């Protein structure tokens, strides 16, 4: 069983942190130290966050590998949590089903350009060969004020599967209704949002697999609330071939 201990990439206190990690694993408090990173995009073009943070990770890896201590990475943000980026990005943000407003704190997981970006971030991380990589609970979309995502990418996929074109406003009304047609579109919307998240996670996994397919993938969640959205699907997609 994994017993993960979250650690900061604080190079100013590297000696104390490394000593703490070694002691934790020696005494059975934890099995792995998980260093926090954030890959949610910022800037146009997007800043290479993975490379910047992995340079700090390298300093810890060198010391921990010599001691035999095990370590991995918690990617604390991929789509984005609740914080507005310091610099705007060029990817598609999520769009509210209710009113059509963009919410820039979260990227749309169906945007093909975002998927290319996030896959490359995980490929760069995999070059450091962490034993475990964990995704944080910002993968969900339905628990957010947007009630999923009704951007151009999601609406196009809904219309493709339905075989007819409807607007965001019509989709919203269907999600409020109780007819058979309403239920069809509400279920279709859930399916499309779920698949967009899962396929985005698969892109992240592909980034790892291009370098090191043995890395154990883990998905976190707060299982007493709504933050476990589709985590059974995403955990399977991210675990890696042959991993639990």
Question: Where do the PLM segments sit?
Answer:
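The substrate-binding groove and active-site-proximal loops of carbohydrate-active enzymes
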Residues: 2-12, 38-54, 100-119, 181-198, ...
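Hydrophobic faces of well-ordered beta-strands that scaffold small-molecule active sites
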Residues: 2-6, 32-34, 71-75, 133-135, ...
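Active-site beta-loop-alpha junctions enriched in small/polar residues
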Residues: 7-11, 37-39, 76-80, 138-140, ...
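Short, acidic/polar
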Residues: 9-25, 113-125, 229-240
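Catalytic domains of carbohydrate-active enzymes, especially glycoside hydrolases
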Residues: 14-41, 127-132
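Aromatic-lined substrate-binding rim segments of carbohydrate-active enzymes
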Residues: 20-21, 37-91, 200-208
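Active-site-adjacent "subsite" loops/lids of carbohydrate-active enzymes
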Residues: 70-128, 141-145, 152, 158, ...
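Substrate-binding cleft/loops of secretory-pathway carbohydrate-active enzymes
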Residues: 143, 197-244
């Amino acid at each position: 069983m994994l017993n993960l201990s979250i650690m900061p990439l604080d190079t100013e206190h590297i000696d104390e942190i490394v000593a703490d990690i070694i002691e934790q694993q020696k005494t059975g408090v934890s099995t792995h130290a998980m260093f926090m990173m954030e890959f949610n995009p910022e800037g146009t073009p997007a800043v290479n966050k993975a490379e910047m943070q992995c340079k700090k990770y390298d300093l810890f890896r060198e010391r921990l590998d010599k001691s035999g201590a095990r370590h991995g990475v918690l990617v604390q943000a991929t789509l984005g949590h609740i914080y507005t980026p310091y610099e705007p990005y060029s990817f598609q943000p999520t769009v509210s089903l209710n009113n059509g407003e963009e919410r820039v704190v979260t990227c749309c997981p169906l945007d093909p350009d975002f998927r290319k970006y996030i896959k490359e971030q995980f490929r760069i991380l995999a070059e450091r060969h962490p034993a475990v990589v964990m995704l944080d609970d910002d993968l969900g979309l339905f628990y957010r004020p947007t009630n999923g995502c009704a951007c151009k990418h999601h609406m196009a996929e809904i219309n493709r599967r339905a075989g007819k074109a409807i607007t965001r406003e019509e989709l919203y009304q269907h999600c409020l209704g109780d007819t058979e047609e309403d239920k069809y579109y509400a279920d279709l919307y859930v399916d499309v949002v779920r698949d967009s998240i899962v396929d985005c996670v698969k892109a992240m996994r592909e980034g790892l697999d291009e370098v090191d397919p043995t890395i154990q993938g883990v998905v976190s969640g707060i299982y007493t609330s709504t933050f476990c959205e589709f985590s059974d699907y995403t955990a399977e997609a991210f675990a890696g071939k042959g991993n639990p």
